[in-house]
From Swiss-Prot:
A Pfam cross-reference name: F-box
Protein name: Putative F-box protein At1g71320
InterPro entries per UniProt: F-box-assoc_dom_typ1, F-box-assoc_interact_dom, F-box-like_dom_sf, F-box_dom, SCF_F-box_component
Protein species of origin: Arabidopsis thaliana
Domain F-box: 8-55
């Protein structure tokens, strides 16, 4: 009987709800180990439901935020303490295809740019014309390729007067008889975020056309739950343009873009889209002296949009947007005297300042490089969400 006890140990079954509760308290590295033990646990850990609950539970005042920096050589580096730095090659985006005996087409003018981040997933593009964009999880190294559709522009336009006079754009109707290949365009801007009502993820594609008298844009939404691409608006923004040096920022169910005054090229307002209603709205910038786009830094802090002038003054002020439907207002949440802080002390609170603190010394000394850092670096919270699991 003693031998039977040793040779036939009892099997212990852990209920799913108890296992999930345990997993919520484990670090990412431990979760990765549990994934290889059970397909059921893999599905649980990679699910958006699990990640949503885990993000809520870890909604601490100092979240475990990391930065992903894409170098010119198509290598991704995690900006952390140097002793713990992690570097991996995004082979999917590698420019050197010699191992596969493929020739590189110099005419493609390959580039890599960060387009946005939400729930630990990062959206990238690798061509100037957006022919391919990728959704990656820097933590698990998984990725999914997305292929935006061409947008066709009408030859004749008819203008509709907006119902609300305070809208600085005109929504357009379109009359189309025929198309020519020259009017087929790929998107010029994109953003990635989550519909917080339906808990589904969406990519917003912006197609711009700037003419002498009018500046128009069309918007498409790519729903990752079903792969559907649909038009959500055709607008004339008239007196302003999108800021090319700023990428979109996701926060609390909306995507935000900075716009500039067309003639002066100075900061104008924020253009936002609610990812549930898929409607655009304008948001005034906070009352500060910021005028130039290169000075403005935007990021997501605890699901609220934050904004700061990172170059103009030694007194760095951080503004946070409160979205209390139907009103939105800015609140000053930090004021930091930069000239009395040594840059090597900023790493402890870099998450407060977004990209500006991660590259603080570089940005202060080389202002012409700000847009380069901004378009190749993004913050994210590590999760185990699998990009391929977003498609049903």
């Amino acid at each position: 009987m003693e031998n039977d006890k040793h040779n036939n140990p009892k099997t212990i079954f852990i209920p799913d709800d108890i296992a999930e509760g345990i997993f919520h308290h484990l670090p990412i590295k431990s979760l990765a180990r549990f994934k290889v033990l059970s397909k059921k646990w893999t599905s649980m850990i990679e699910s958006t439901y699990f990640s949503h609950k885990r993000l809520i539970r870890t909604g601490l005042p100092t979240p475990n935020m990391k930065f992903l920096h894409i170098s010119q050589h198509f290598t991704a580096n995690f900006v952390e303490e140097y002793s713990n730095s992690i570097t991996f090659l995004l082979e999917t985006f590698s420019r050197d295809d010699q191992n596969n005996r493929k020739t590189f087409d110099e005419s493609q003018n390959k580039t890599i740019q960060v387009l946005g981040s939400c729930d630990g997933l990062v959206l990238l593009r690798i061509h100037d014309d957006f022919r391919s964009i990728y959704l990656i999880n820097p933590t698990t190294k998984e990725h999914m390729k997305l292929s935006p559709e061409f947008m066709q522009w009408p030859f004749t336009l008819s203008y509709l007067t907006p119902a609300m006079a305070n809208k600085p754009w005109r929504q357009l109707s379109q009359s189309v008889l025929d198309y020519d290949i020259s009017v087929k365009r790929m998107p010029s801007l994109a953003g990635f975020g989550k519909d917080i009502v339906k808990k589904s993820y969406k990519v917003v594609l912006i197609y711009t056309r700037y003419e002498i008298h009018d500046h128009e844009f069309k918007a498409k939404v790519l729903s990752l739950d079903n792969g559907e691409q649909r038009d959500v608006g055709f607008y004339d923004i008239h007196h302003c343009i999108f800021c090319d040096e700023q990428t979109s920022v996701y926060a609390n169910g909306s995507l935000f873009w900075l716009t500039l005054k067309k003639l002066s090229q100075t900061s104008y307002q924020l253009l936002a889209i609610d990812l549930h209603t898929e409607e655009f709205r304008w948001i005034l910038l906070p009352e500060c002296d910021t005028k130039y786009a290169t000075n403005i830094e935007m990021w997501n802090l605890n699901e609220r949009l934050c904004l700061s002038d990172v170059l103009e003054s030694s007194n760095l002020v951080v503004w946070s947007l409160h979205q209390e439907y139907p009103t939105e207002k800015w609140e000053k949440i930090y004021s930091i005297k930069i000239d009395v802080i040594r840059t090597n002390q900023l790493h402890e609170k870099f998450w407060m300042l977004g990209l500006a603190a991660a590259y603080f010394s570089n940005i202060r000394n080389r202002q012409d490089q700000v847009s380069f850092f901004r378009q190749r670096t993004i913050s994210y919270l590590p999760t185990m969400i699998s990009p391929s699991n977003l498609m049903l």
